[in-house]
UniProtKB/Swiss-Prot annotation:
InterPro entries, sorted: DNA_methylase_N6_adenine_CS, MT-A70-like, SAM-dependent_MTases_sf
Protein task: Methylates DNA on the 6th position of adenine (N(6)-methyladenosine). N(6)-methyladenosine (m6A) DNA is involved in epigenetic transgenerational inheritance.
Catalytic activity line of the entry: a 2'-deoxyadenosine in DNA + S-adenosyl-L-methionine = an N(6)-methyl-2'-deoxyadenosine in DNA + S-adenosyl-L-homocysteine + H(+)
Gene that this sequence comes from: damt-1
Keywords carried by this UniProt record: Methyltransferase, S-adenosyl-L-methionine, Transferase
Magnesium keyword on record: no
UniProt-recorded Gene Ontology molecular function terms: methyltransferase activity; nucleic acid binding; site-specific DNA-methyltransferase (adenine-specific) activity
Superkingdom field: Eukaryota
GO BP: epigenetic regulation of gene expression; methylation
Name used for this protein in its record: DNA N6-methyl methyltransferase
Top EC group: transferase
Pfam families, alphabetized: MT-A70 (PF05063)
Species this chain originates from: Caenorhabditis elegans
Keyword S-adenosyl-L-methionine among record annotations: yes
């Protein structure tokens, strides 16, 4: 951890969460050994040793220039600390992409009219016992100090972090749940389904920002809560989010960048990519305007991570925030597709990435 940046190891984080079950994350999900590119471009580079696309004069924004300089610094430090691998596997991340396809090949029950009831289990539970007419409308909690297991009708196992609570359904259901249980959250992390012409998630939310405008975020927050929103690199989106925070009576305290890197420490995209794909995403952090709590957060922090090969998955942030002295007792993740310990997670696919297709037995233990 540097004052300007950090290098996260998401794989090790999940391994630590499920150590009690003798599980580890499937390492191939993180075998991002080369930059992201179409197979045709990769084959051309492999044959000729050069890219097959014509480069225009390099045009990068001030933001990209800063990130490019930071990427060099991160690679140098990571190499010196022997964090990064020296050799890459020349398969255009094929093994990792196949692992992602397998990881997503699971069935998540449909949501029905939301209930505020919490069903608790500890060691193991059958998915059928959590469902009604083939759908889930309750909130499910793994109440033990160790991870639990949910098994569906075909024998597929889902591994649930300790003291985590999840709900399959619309994120707006959290408002009714919050009122029913007199529960406010002191940390909210959200990864909304921002509209994209090139990528559309499996049927989940409307692919626009209307779902955000329907959320009444302030009513589920404690007075001194911190909120963290992932945003895309679409032009104007940061300004839109600032306006939305203002509507919620909140102000931005910092904007961080996630730099996505290969196992060798290189950015997964070129900074002058003609298709406007860049190797970083932004995380906006905000608090209530009338809160007197001071968050000692660097304004322009960068954290680098080898991404899981599942599209749009973001690294867990709890330990990173704790490093900066952020104390929280009731964290909430909106639009969740994976679960975290002692955290409420809400979305149409909250335990998508908890299946046995993501984890395997840790034979080293």
């Amino acid at each position: 951890m540097d004052t300007e940046f950090a290098i996260l190891d998401e794989e090790k984080y999940y391994d630590s969460v499920f150590k009690e079950l003798n599980l580890k994350t499937r390492s191939e999900l993180y075998e991002i050994s080369s930059k992201f590119m179409p197979d045709s471009q990769f084959e051309a580079i492999k044959r000729r040793g050069i890219s097959n696309r014509k480069r225009k004069i390099k045009e990068t924004s001030e933001n990209s220039n800063r990130m490019e300089q930071m990427a060099l610094k991160i690679k140098n430090v990571g190499t010196e600390l022997k964090i990064f691998k020296k050799k890459s596997i020349l398969d255009n991340n094929l093994k990792s992409r196949k692992a992602a396809e397998t990881a997503l090949n699971v069935s998540i029950p449909s949501a029905s009219a939301s209930s505020e009831q919490i069903i608790e289990f500890q060691k193991s539970e059958s998915l059928s016992n959590l469902m009604s007419n083939g759908m889930i409308n309750n909130w499910v909690r793994c109440s033990g100090d160790k991870p639990g297991i949910i098994e569906n009708s075909d024998g597929t196992k889902f591994y649930i972090p300790p003291k985590s609570t999840f709900h399959v359904g619309d994120v707006k259901d959290i408002e009714q749940y919050s009122r029913a249980h007199d529960l406010l959250f002191d940390l909210i992390i959200a990864d909304p389904p921002w509209f994209s012409k090139s990528v559309k998630r499996k049927r989940t939310y409307q692919m626009d920002e209307e779902v955000l405008d329907c959320l009444d975020i302030p009513v589920i927050l404690t007075h001194d809560a911190l909120i963290a929103f992932w945003i895309t690199n679409r032009i104007g989106i940061e300004e839109e989010m600032i306006e939305r925070f203002d509507k919620w009576g909140m102000e931005v305290v910092a904007t961080w960048k996630l730099l996505k890197i290969t196992t060798q420490g290189d950015p997964v995209y070129d900074f002058d990519n003609q298709k406007h794909k860049v190797p970083f995403e932004s995380l906006m952090l905000a608090k209530k305007k009338d809160s007197m709590r001071k968050f000692e957060l660097p304004e322009n922090f960068v954290f680098a991570s080898v991404p899981m090969s599942v599209h749009s998955h973001k690294p867990p942030l709890l330990d990173l925030l704790r490093h900066f002295g952020i104390e929280f007792t009731e964290p909430l993740e909106l639009f969740a597709r994976s679960l975290l310990p002692s955290t409420h997670s809400v979305g149409y696919e909250p335990f998508l990435l908890q299946s046995e297709h993501v984890f395997t037995r840790n034979i080293s233990l």
